[in-house]
Amino acid sequence: MKNQYFSLFQLPAQFELDSALLNERYRALAAQCHPDKFAAHSAFEQKQAMMMATTINEAYRTLQDPIQRAAYLLQAQDIDADAPEHTQFAPEFLMQQMEWREALADAHSEQNEQALQQLANEISQAQQDLLQQLQQAFSAQQYETAAQLVRQGRFLAKLQQEIQAALP
C-alpha cells in the first residue's frame, strides 16, 4: 500500500511534515502496541505486537528524516531515487563535492578544528537549502528533480558525518 507510513500516523502524504505531531502520534502508537503489554497474551498476539512495533519504528525513522521521507514519497510515485538515472550529479554539484572533499582532507590532515567547524557549518547550510529545494520540487510535483535532490542530500549527510568524525 502506497504511503502506508503516513496512514499509520494519520498524516497527509506530503514532504512538509509537522514533526511535533509525528512525535506525538509515534509515542501513542508505540505505547499501544509495546511488546510488554502483550506479555500475558498468546504467542501469536505477542508476535503480532512485535511486528507492529517494528513497523511503527521503521515508519517513524523514515518519516522523521527528511531525505528518507522524500525517497519514500518518490517510491509512491514509482520513482527510485537510487536508480542509475538519478545517480548522475550536475557538473556544478560535482565540482562543489570535490571542493568540499578537498577542504575536508586539508582540514583533517592539518588537524584544523576551526576549518572543520567552518566546513560543517557550510554543509549544514547546504542541507537546509536542499530541504527548501525539495519542498519546492514536491509542491510543484517535480519528482525527477526531487530524486536528484535526494541523492545530493544523501551525499551531504554522509559528508557531514565524515566531518563530525574528524572533529576532536
Residue ranges and their predicted role:
Residues 1-168:
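C-terminal accessory/regulatory regions appended to core domains
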